[in-house]
UniProtKB/Swiss-Prot annotation:
Details of cofactor binding: Binds 1 zinc ion per subunit.
Active site per the UniProt annotation: 384
The protein's required cofactors: Zn(2+)
GO MF terms held by the record: endopeptidase activity; metal ion binding; metallodipeptidase activity; metalloendopeptidase activity; metalloendopeptidase activity involved in amyloid precursor protein catabolic process; metallopeptidase activity; protein homodimerization activity; protein kinase binding
Enzyme Commission (EC) number: 3.4.24.81
N-terminal signal peptide: 1-19
Protein name: Disintegrin and metalloproteinase domain-containing protein 10
PROSITE patterns the UniProt entry points to: ADAM_MEPRO, DISINTEGRIN_2, ZINC_PROTEASE
Nucleotidyltransferase among keywords: no
InterPro entries given in the database record: ADAM10_ADAM17, ADAM10_Cys-rich, ADAM_Metalloproteinase, Disintegrin_dom, Disintegrin_dom_sf, MetalloPept_cat_dom_sf, Peptidase_M12B
Amino acid sequence: MVLLRVLILLLSWVAGLGGQYGNPLNKYIRHYEGLSYDVDSLHQKHQRAKRAVSHEDQFLRLDFHAHGRHFNLRMKRDTSLFSEEFRVETSNAVLDYDTSHIYTGHIYGEEGSFSHGSVIDGRFEGFIQTHGGTFYVEPAERYIKDRTLPFHSVIYHEDDIKYPHKYGPQGGCADHSVFERMRKYQMTGVEEVTQTPQEKHAINGPELLRKKRTTVAEKNTCQLYIQTDHLFFKYYGTREAVIAQISSHVKAIDTIYQTTDFSGIRNISFMVKRIRINTTADEKDPTNPFRFPNIGVEKFLELNSEQNHDDYCLAYVFTDRDFDDGVLGLAWVGAPSGSSGGICEKSKLYSDGKKKSLNTGIITVQNYGSHVPPKVSHITFAHEVGHNFGSPHDSGTECTPGESKNLGQKENGNYIMYARATSGDKLNNNKFSLCSIRNISQVLEKKRNNCFVESGQPICGNGMVEQGEECDCGYSDQCKDECCYDANQPEGKKCKLKPGKQCSPSQGPCCTAHCAFKSKTEKCRDDSDCAKEGICNGITALCPASDPKPNFTDCNRHTQVCINGQCAGSICEKHGLEECTCASSDGKDDKELCHVCCMKKMEPSTCASTGSVQWNKYFLGRTITLQPGSPCNDFRGYCDVFMRCRLVDADGPLARLKKAIFSPELYENIAEWIVAYWWAVLLMGIALIMLMAGFIKICSVHTPSSNPKLPPPKPLPGTLKRRRPPQPIQQPQRQRPRESYQMGHMRR
């Protein structure tokens, strides 16, 4: 009997456990599995990786089994998402925050896989991209409140995410009327004189030029300022968890935008510059603009926009609010010209008399009473940022295939900028449509130089082999290399050598087009003034360093000599002399001032041109001149292309004129002249008085006067008189009173 009871209990527990693993987490996730790996062990590994010095110890390893497969994660701290000036701001302080709990990696042995997440208290939370789709890992208590669970985390596949509002009449972004009101408001911005000409200049049409590949660093990174309100903090519980969520969202959109070719503009990335966390303690803070519980989505965006965000490309607020009509996010739409808003927009005055920054947006993780899966929230964030980048909602059959009657097109789903939220499980859900790419390309072309920065991170596809890359031949439309995978290949494969290839020409000139090292006799670098030609060594694609030419070899057009392979010495040193500067104080003309001059060591009085008789035994009468632009005349001027020394006047012509007029020497010279030639000054004074008296006498008889006792003025002789044609004699009319005339004039 006891045995039967135990058997029944055991079967019940197994059945219950199996049912629990198959039950949905909420109405959006229909299947999950539990994870119960050793959290203490992972926490210790995280601490070791955090303190690691060696390259090998910096990697964090996590192994577990779920969904019928094994996950062997190899991860490393991710520093690419946070700028060097990254700060975390709270109501009490601004902190230099440690982001060592943020990791990026891959599945060991699975090419093209990718993982990103955080390790907090020994638990991994994030997403894992595999060839079979993307898996999401989250803490179990976020969904299941039972503390007696035999697992601490849940993992589910993106195919098990079913978002019921994706094609419904509501959910996702705001409706057309909201965007129309926002568009009209954006048109009322008052331009300020501090704006750059690039911001004010309007383009006549799309300017979608293909960019040539360049090896110079591009401004391709949009720096973010992200705030979270007290409700967002309340849901996730800790500061570390909040930052992990922000990191996950930014990494998700970074992956989407980096892999999109915006008409030749590539590698667009994102970096967090500052985070403001409003905790539950800020709920009653009167300075907290987001403290009220019931704020509509438009007002919530307005509160974010009323702050000055000039230091950032974009500024977002993350919240946990259930907005009306299922809205998950809202943002100002950018434009290349004609209206305010979007990336790089500066604070300015608008029609309501308020200064606002319209480079803003908001995101919520709650919809219709339930928290949306991270996948949906990530796509929403990418969607709203797409608005900031200049894309309106997709429309037309070309850009909304999910509404097509063609089953093949409909199966691929809609693109990121579709008006309603998507679950992200369709092929097109993580891509931009051609309509969006055209719009975003115009805005990037116009505005990115106003606030985008260089990422400082290795970029696969820029033609330079950087850290973490084996080779770099560019993108698929640029790569002519048979040895290297181009930048359009998946993660773990791009910018890597193809199997069986020794090298790639992108690594250096000592690799052939057939992916083999050149022989030891082949030249890879021409000789220079101070270095011999470079010769390949047969074991590397890089061209080895060239041997230096002998010291005191002439270089730089015989004006200098080589020292240890560098053109760094003066030609004077070749003959045991020192270089000096010929100065005008020594009686040199402006042409000789641009000669190379030498002197005996410690004897400045011997300074003379190389063409002088004094140094004829060294230079054989050959005059060596300085290079155009070189300083001359004891650094008071520079040599022009005609080898003449042009003096430098830092003050400019206006300052010279001021000095000439107000110079004390000028007035001293005038005073001395007056003393010496007093009689001339006296004669000039008498002549001036007589001239003025004569002018008055002559002109007074022709000047009218109001004095009735004076005779009338005499007409000037020889003046032209205006002849008027004879007028017909008219009968005199009775003059109307002044009042009557004025009233008649007003009536007319």
